[in-house]
Amino acid sequence: MKKLTSNDVTPEEIFYQRRKIIKAFGLSAVATALPTFSFAQESSDLKALEYKKSTESTLILTPENKVTGYNNFYEFGVDKGSPAHYAKKFQVNPWKLEIGGEVENPFTLNYDQLFTQFPLEERIYRFRCVEAWAMVVPWIGFELNKLLEKAKPTSKAKYVVFHTLYDPEQMPGQKNHFFGGGIHYPYVEALTLAEAMHSLTLMSVGLYGKALAPQNGAPIRLVVPWKYGFKSIKSIVKITLSETRPRTTWESLAPNEYGFYANVNPKVDHPRWSQASERVIGAGGLLRVKRQPTLMFNGYEREVAHLYKGLDLRINY
């Protein structure tokens, strides 16, 4: 994995929103009418976690207020600051995470068990959005394979499907089709079983030493560091192992723009922008945007390239 230097620190900057995407669906007037907020839930309100701290990474972390204040979570609005504003009162306790489908041992975890069922550890990962911006985040969680091993997938299990909470009373983007970016909720994502079992794939319950803020996907979210951020589904309530591949949310909304695999790939551009480079959030100053080359698989090529042996990644994007 390529090491980042002190020049790769990623404080926040104001840059392009996914309004280009929204315009494609005729929602630009609504999107531009939405306010932009820059404040997030106070970190002091969040539960401190016990976890094994990372001692190996040399990546330079994104400042905490940038990670919690610049988010895509359309259930709470399409502007980057909207999730931090509209998710302030989002209730994550009680919570229920159901694991089922093609498994021998279906089970359910409650809120407290999300933090105690498996030992927690810190993983410092690059985070790459499909919008061509990047951060470095100190996630806290457990490997998804630990949860799957407990569930005991059957021989029919080929895919792992994730569902976000559906609660329009708490999530205004689910209640208002336009406010939520035109998405048909609940949000659905999926991985192949091999991807889900990989040791880099994380179920995160926290960052920066504390439980996740609502805008970051509390109380539990997926983190797949070699894929674009929309694959790392937030506020998960159901995990189902399936024999067949589902149609995921962005794949359903714009299949020519968002594929199932969504691996970070500098050689495969989005139809409306290049993926060859990425903006480092906040670096470069007010009048200058810092860009850096995009790394294949977001810098995790050595660890995950074997998962796609024989697969044409230009077609299977």
UniProtKB/Swiss-Prot annotation:
GO terms for biological process: protein repair. Its cofactor is Mo-molybdopterin. Transmembrane segments: none annotated. GO terms for molecular function: metal ion binding; molybdopterin cofactor binding; oxidoreductase activity, acting on a sulfur group of donors, quinone or similar compound as acceptor. It comes from the Bacteria. Heterodimer of a catalytic subunit (MsrP) and a heme-binding subunit (MsrQ). This is Protein-methionine-sulfoxide reductase catalytic subunit MsrP. The lineage of its organism: Bacteria, Pseudomonadati, Pseudomonadota, Gammaproteobacteria, Pasteurellales. The gene is msrP.
